[in-house]
Amino acid sequence: MMQSKIESIIEECRKYTREGEVASYIPELKKADKDALGIYIDKLDGNEFCAGDYDTKFTIQSISKIIALIIAIMDNGMEKVLSKVGVEPSAYSFNSIVTLEVKNANKPLNPMINAGAIATVSLIKGNSPEEIIERILEFTRKVTGNKNIKVNEEVYQSEKKTGDRNRSLAYFMKGTGIIEKDVEKVLDAYFQQCSIEVTCKDIAKIASFLANDGVLPSTGERIIPAEVAKIVKAVMVTCGMYDASGSFAVKVGIPSKSGVGGGILATVPGVMGIGVFGPALDKKGNSIAGVKILERLSEELNLSIF
């Protein structure tokens, strides 16, 4: 029943890909197939379902901000992280500099927009970009159970070449004391983090680990305290879908995080993790058909947490 349901939802939502565009500001992302669409569901009871282009690889992009936030909290405690990054929603686009200047004592509004994510990466322990990215990769491999996860070198170089907006955000934060480390090293780790290559299954596994409050459903091993998982899910609800987070909470009601690579990670507490992929994006930078799939799924299975 679940299998046929997700297959029909995928087909039903495929038409929406025509209304979106693949990300073009990072040249490598332009190469994505606009019509691709896939889903993977990892239920906490051990059942797994998938449909469409669920095994297509794509770069994690902003979904990695969840992982960076978890590691930063584990390294520093929540209080220290909150002294550098807020947890308030933003009405501006994900790469905006506006709020850094006019709000919040120069502190980025939240860890899910670029400025906040760069500040978060700067808090991860490690003396070099290599050390930091290795810790992020190690964590991602552990949680997904996929030892082959790695950085896509072409996308990383492409991000680095076109990352001037992110550089300006980072140097501004260095100037205001939010970032204490060497800016170029922090940015290098950030660009690599965004270029980690995953599939729907990988992000569904991260989502189910969060749905299970920090315990790996497959082994029963606790990776992070339940409290940290809860904090991350709360931030996902308020800030995870960029400046469309409010309408997404109303229509879908599932803690989620999107990325401009076309992925959306959605975590239904106590029930399941969902990974969706569709590189055609809406104006806010979210997968246009991916959002529709989650709307339909939430409606049909009554998944809203509200």
Curated annotation (Swiss-Prot):
A family per Pfam: Glutaminase
Gene3D superfamilies membership: DD-peptidase/beta-lactamase superfamily
Record keywords, A-Z: Hydrolase
Binding site for substrate: S62, N114, E159, N166, Y190, Y242, V260
Enzyme class: hydrolase
GO molecular function, one term: glutaminase activity
Alphabetical GO biological process terms: glutamate biosynthetic process; glutamine catabolic process
Catalytic activity annotation: L-glutamine + H2O = L-glutamate + NH4(+)
SUPFAM superfamilies associated with the record: beta-lactamase/transpeptidase-like (SSF56601)
Signal peptide as annotated in the record: none
Complexes and interactors: Homotetramer.
Similarity comment: Belongs to the glutaminase family.
Protein's name in the database: Glutaminase
Species this chain originates from: Clostridium tetani (strain Massachusetts / E88)
Gene giving rise to this polypeptide: glsA
